[in-house]
Swiss-Prot record:
Keywords: ATP-binding, Coenzyme A biosynthesis, Cytoplasm, Nucleotide-binding, Nucleotidyltransferase, Transferase
Coiled coil: none
Gene this protein is translated from: coaD
Protein name, entry field: Phosphopantetheine adenylyltransferase
EC class: transferase
GO molecular function: ATP binding; pantetheine-phosphate adenylyltransferase activity
Function: Reversibly transfers an adenylyl group from ATP to 4'-phosphopantetheine, yielding dephospho-CoA (dPCoA) and pyrophosphate.
InterPro entries per the UniProt record, alphabetical: Archaeal_FAD_synthase, Cyt_trans-like, PPAT_arch, Rossmann-like_a/b/a_fold
Pfam families recorded: CTP_transf_like (PF01467)
Higher taxonomy: Archaea, Methanobacteriati, Methanobacteriota, Methanomada group, Methanobacteria
Length: 164
């Protein structure tokens, strides 16, 4: 099947690999012949807070998911928000979540300043957990949900009954 773009970028921390990550990657593979996947380095991810899995673990989990994909892909470490999207003219599109869409706009501003063609930005909605709140690595780390978005524990107070 011919896909719309020759080279597509997608990036993230990919901590606690979850259903939202799968959705993001599946969209990149749906539209791209070759998908370049950037995974934030330990140093870059440290700015997001504590408890993030080491880059080696995150890349291993990602590779396990990608193993069965019928597409050409490359996984690389990201030391900044942009990776090679601002230095490689060959990229045609970037797949992002609503949360990371502003970074894609920054990438396009840098590409424009360098005389590169802007990337088509493909934005996907966040994937909600069973409680209707988006799945996130933070929620998984807190023990609220599992990687598929199923509720693990109720938030304190949500189970309290009003005393009469």
């Amino acid at each position: 099947m011919k896909r719309k773009y020759s080279l597509v970028a997608v990036g993230g921390t990919f901590d606690r690999f979850h259903k939202g990550h799968r959705r993001l990657l599946d969209e990149a593979f749906r539209v791209g012949e070759t998908v370049m996947i950037g995974v934030t380095s330990d140093e870059f991810a440290a700015a997001k807070g504590e408890g993030i899995e080491p880059c080696s673990v995150r890349m291993k989990n990602l590779e396990e998911y990608l193993r069965d994909k019928d597409a050409d892909y490359h996984v690389m470490r990201l030391d900044d928000p942009y990776g090679t999207t601002v230095t490689d003219e060959a990229f045609e599109a970037i797949v992002v979540s609503r949360e990371t869409e502003p970074v894609a706009r920054e990438i396009n501003a840098i590409r424009r300043n360098r005389g590169f063609r802007e990337l088509d930005i493909i934005t996907i909605d966040m994937v909600n957990a069973d409680d209707g709140i988006p799945i996130s690595s933070t929620r998984i780390r807190r023990g609220e949900i599992d990687p598929m978005g199923h509720i693990i524990k109720r938030i304190r107070g949500a189970l309290r009954r009003r005393r009469e």
